[in-house]
């Protein structure tokens, strides 16, 4: 099966990434990607875009040359309370909210601290998807996190970049996470975590994890634009007519 939805991509607004919005559109069109999200790092990261970047995402068109674009953020989980670096009514203006641990904002601590932070972030209602929860720098109680995510309709990401250029040692953790989410009845989503447009929609290693555990395709949000958009609507985001052309 070809997966034509990607929820995790960074532009040059995060200055350790190397592609523009237009670069991503060109690659998406060439690869036949139907829907992707621009999710630059939240403002507490040292080289992240200014807060206004996210406020002004309203200027981005939702459909360009047949490709759907989601306005999003990869927020930083800041502390054990699960707080993130984007807040209030501004969150409601975004189409998708990812959040995860990043060393400059939340330095690695203990397994219990990481688990508490993730569960509190999940329970806050502010986060749709937890990014790279398999990061070996942040050990977690996988069953507790998977159970909380399933209960609160939050998806956990299998991050393809973790197997390639960062967070080496994630494979066993991601297999454990996928098995736990499967058992809990929860949702997974694959993210390329692209920092250059060429990797948009590339999920080869993440797919291996999905196939290894026999994860049910009907609970994988990348399976179609409709699956992801329905999930986001169920999470309280606006249902937008502009995306109707993406639904088969």
Curated annotation (Swiss-Prot):
Zn(2+) 2 binds at residues 16, 41, 195. SMART domains: POLIIIAc. Transmembrane segments: none annotated. Pfam families: PHP. It comes from the Bacteria. One of its GO terms (molecular function) is zinc ion binding. Binds 3 Zn(2+) ions per subunit. Gene3D superfamilies: Metal-dependent hydrolases. Its EC number is 3.1.3.-. GO terms for cellular component: cytosol. InterPro entries: Phosphatase_YcdX_put, PHP_dom, PHP_phosphatase, Pol/His_phosphatase_N, Pol/histidinol_Pase-like. It is an enzyme of class 3 (hydrolase). PANTHER family: PHOSPHATASE YCDX-RELATED. Belongs to the PHP family. This is Probable phosphatase Sfri_3709. It comes from Shewanella frigidimarina (strain NCIMB 400).
């Amino acid at each position: 099966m070809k997966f034509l939805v990607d929820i995790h991509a960074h532009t040059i607004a995060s200055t350790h990434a190397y592609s523009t919005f237009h670069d991503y559109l060109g690659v998406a069109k060439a690869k036949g990607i139907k829907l992707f999200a621009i999710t630059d790092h939240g403002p507490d990261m040292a080289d992240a875009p200014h807060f206004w970047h996210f406020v002004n995402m309203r200027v981005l068109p939702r459909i360009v040359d047949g490709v759907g674009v989601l306005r999003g953020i990869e927020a930083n989980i800041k502390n054990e309370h699960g707080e993130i670096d984007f807040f209030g009514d501004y969150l409601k203006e975004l189409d998708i909210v990812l959040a995860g641990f990043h060393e400059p904002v939340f330095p690695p601590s203990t397994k219990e601290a990481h688990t508490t932070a993730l569960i509190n972030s999940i329970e806050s209602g502010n986060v749709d998807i937890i990014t790279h929860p398999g990061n070996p720098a942040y050990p977690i109680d996988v069953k507790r996190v998977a159970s909380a995510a399933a209960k609160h309709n939050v998806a956990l990401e299998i991050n393809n970049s973790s197997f390639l250029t960062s967070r080496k040692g994630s494979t066993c953790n991601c297999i454990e996470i996928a098995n736990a989410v499967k058992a809990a009845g929860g949702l997974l989503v694959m993210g390329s975590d692209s920092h250059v447009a060429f990797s948009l929609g590339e999920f080869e290693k993440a797919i291996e994890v999905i196939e290894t555990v026999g994860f049910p395709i009907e609970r994988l949000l990348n399976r179609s634009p409709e699956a992801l958009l329905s999930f986001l609507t169920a999470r309280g985001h606006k249902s937008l007519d502009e995306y109707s052309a993406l639904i088969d």
